[in-house]
Regions:
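Nucleotide phosphate-binding/pyrophosphate-handling subdomain across enzymes
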Residues: 38, 134-137, 145-158, 162-166, ...
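Beta-strand->loop->alpha-helix junctions that form or flank phosphate-binding loops
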Residues: 71, 194-195, 207-229, 245-250, ...
Length: 422
């Protein structure tokens, strides 16, 4: 199979959508001899920050000398990014071979796997066959009934910042969502939690007590910023002084605190991770599309924030790094997001909006988004294509100005490709 044929099969229309439950992926992996049971894991869930936290953890573990797998979603530039070993995406020929192997197994299942379940099975099989020492595995959505929860008890079950998102599936309260996400906590693991409201923390604590799993909460009081510019951050956390992190924004320091707390938990469980590996790993962390500066003159920033909590962080970062600067906002969003609350955060900082339609079946049409954004009293232009939107953004932004591309991770890859062509 060619790569195009592989991706066409993976994205088959009849497999689209999310169907919670572990029976299908468990059956599929069982047909392969359950390769997922032969690997160690860090399992990471949360509403915001889980991808960045995964990237930091994988980078530190790699710096410590461990063969480290990383499983995340969605991708920005190429599908292969979703599964990596030591920072390298799965090769095209390996991906093709795995799909050719799994295809007949999946096709003969009475209850066939969803797209996410198939992709997860591919990743878990690859990591096992490559004999990874440890895999950092990001939950797709929720936790308890997410396909990634087919893995055995992880070394650490990490819960990043929890808020309201995917409410039609996960629940309408933060506590209900936390209960679903806490489903990744299993007997034999150690849970790590981003500090949260007492009612939410109690939900997680109840799950930990039920599973007999110890719980460690990251200590944000031990976190302090030393230096913060568009080139990166220097910070202290507990005994760690002068740590460097290329990811920008105060929210990334809090994510780093969760990652460092997880590293301490791994040490308690016998993993050898020295301070030099921590320093090197954090300094080398790469996670595109999170307040990422991709061009200067004008300054162009990509941010994949896609819910109100993300927009709070984005707005805070704009105020911190670009105080008083008018910002051109190129944006697109998925229709099922709470985009009203999202743009309430961003509108006061926007000089103008340019709307586009992300390449996703759930995308809100650019014209409909433009009509909504006009309520904020700022100039709004709807563009028929992302490339047209990027051209308009560059025309509307002076050389000493700033443009922010945001609203959906599904938008960013096309923005970068368009920037390379205009």
């Amino acid at each position: 199979m060619t790569l195009d044929e592989v991706l066409a099969y993976i994205h088959k229309v009849d497999w689209r959508g999310s169907v919670p439950g572990l029976s299908r992926i468990d059956t599929l992996l069982g047909l392969l001899g359950h390769p997922e049971r032969h690997v160690k894991y860090i399992h990471v869930t949360g509403t915001n920050g889980k991808g960045s936290t995964c990237a930091m953890l994988a980078s530190v573990l790699r710096a410590a000398g461990y063969k480290t797998g990383l499983y995340t979603s969605p991708y920005i530039f190429r599908f292969n990014e979703r599964m990596q070993i030591n920072g390298a995406p799965i090769p095209d020929d390996t991906l093709s071979a795995l799909v050719e192997e799994l295809r007949p197994l999946a096709d003969r299942m009475a209850d066939p796997p969803t797209e996410f379940e198939l992709v997860t099975a591919i990743g878990l099989t690859w990591f096992a066959r490559e004999m990874c020492d440890i895999v950092v595995c990001e939950v797709g959505m929720g936790g308890e009934f997410d396909a990634t929860n087919v893995i055995p008890a992880p070394e650490a079950a990490v819960l990043t910042n929890i808020g309201l998102d995917h409410t039609s599936v996960l629940g309408n309260t933060v506590e209900a969502i936390a209960a679903t996400k806490a489903g990744i906590i299993k007997p034999g693991c150690h849970a790590v939690l981003y500090p949260c409201a007492p009612s939410v923390q109690e939900v997680v604590a109840v799950r930990c007590r039920s599973a007999g799993a110890p719980l460690t909460v990251a200590d944000f009081d031990a976190l302090s910023s030393v230096c913060d510019t568009l080139e990166g951050q220097i910070f202290n956390y507990g005994p760690y002084k002068g740590l460097r992190l290329p990811l920008l924004g105060g929210h990334q320091l809090r994510n780093a605190a969760v990652a460092l707390t997880t590293i301490d938990v791994l040490r308690q469980r016998g993993w050898h991770i020295g301070e030099s590996a921590v320093r090197q790993g954090l300094a080398q962390t790469a996670w595109p599309g999170r307040f990422q500066v991709v061009r200067r003159q004008p300054t162009i920033i990509l941010d994949g924030g896609h819910n109100p909590q993300c927009m709070v962080s984005l707005a805070a970062a704009i105020r911190e790094y670009l105080p008083g600067q008018p910002v051109t906002v190129l944006t697109g969003v998925l229709a099922d997001k709470d985009y009203g609350k999202m743009y309430d955060q961003l509108a006061p900082l926007a000089a103008r909006f340019i709307t586009v339609t992300p390449h996703n079946p759930r995308a809100l049409d650019a014209g409909e988004l433009a009509a909504f954004l006009r309520r904020y009293g700022k100039p709004v232009t709807a563009c028929g294509t992302i490339r047209e939107g990027v051209s308009r953004m560059l025309a509307d932004t002076p050389p000493d100005g700033t443009a922010v591309c945001c609203g959906s991770l599904y938008l960013l890859g096309d923005v970068v490709q368009s920037l390379e062509k205009v």
